[in-house]
């Protein structure tokens, strides 16, 4: 995806620092204070233009959401949604998710969403996939005991790789769909990419995976 440069982006982000948290590492362990309540916290890694996080936060005011996106020219679009209609249970982070364990304390997050992540199809780029074992380890570090990952993609190769990676890591697959939009799954909230790809007839894959609280026998 080619990103269009937006020279105003950083100024906009700095102006609305109560929406886009500038130094998330300083908030580690204190995110409930940021939100001002004790509600569970769900994060999306690679939140893009923010439609999924925004719609989730609007539909579930009893849950706090944090969207993480490293590209400034993209996260500013998510910010614009918040400027237009503020949601008290949604914050954004404009940083690389590789630093996830610096942003959050151990057990501070209840769920991780991965939606239409870059498939990085070349073998030499395997370690960049957001379901590679080092990322799975980072998610486990910040999640509560028995925390979950919810993953969606239209890329069959990435989906198959992710199932294998999660299984090898010892995770328990609690929900699996090979064709989400033709399944009985209720309450699906689409991303921008999901709407685009499904309208072209692409099959959408979805899995929910849970970290085990006890070692595998």
Curated annotation (Swiss-Prot):
Keywords for the protein's UniProt record, in alphabetical order: Methyltransferase, S-adenosyl-L-methionine, Transferase, tRNA processing
Pfam family, one: Methyltransf_4
Active-site annotation: 118
PROSITE patterns reported for this sequence: SAM_MT_TRMB
MF-aspect GO terms: tRNA (guanine(46)-N7)-methyltransferase activity
Enzyme class: transferase
Protein name: tRNA (guanine-N(7)-)-methyltransferase
